[in-house]
Amino acid sequence: QPKSTPTLTVFPPSTEELQGNKATLVCLISDFYPSDVEVAWKANGAPISQGVDTANPTKQGNKYIASSFLRLTAEQWRSRNSFTCQVTHEGNTVEKSLSPAECV
């Protein structure tokens, strides 16, 4: 089966969650093959490892899908300019960023 590079989608925290002073970012990693992926998160370009929870890839058709969560406080979310989900797959790196300012 040919290799397939992952597609990334990053979802911002919900308004309800922010009202509760929490912020969870979700990075959806889809349509990749083979199943081996490495996920890293960055805040303002600096690696962030605390609060990261990555689920194991699951098969969807003949490709794989996975998700990674970054749990923050609302304050941490608001105080950074950008958050990036970075995925390394078969030696290639794909990243998708999200800016809190765009998610008001």
From Swiss-Prot:
GO biological process: immunoglobulin mediated immune response
SUPFAM superfamilies: Immunoglobulin
GO CC, one annotated term: IgG immunoglobulin complex
Record has Disulfide bond as a keyword: yes
Signal peptide: none
Disulfide bonds: 27-85
MF terms (GO), sorted A to Z: antigen binding
Any one Pfam family match given in the protein's UniProt record, by short name: C1-set
Residue span, Ig-like domain: 6-99
Keyword Disulfide bond: yes
Keyword annotations of the record: Disulfide bond, Immunoglobulin domain
Highest taxon, organism lineage: Eukaryota
Gene3D superfamilies per record: Immunoglobulins
Protein name (record): Ig lambda-2 chain C region
Lineage: Eukaryota, Metazoa, Chordata, Craniata, Vertebrata
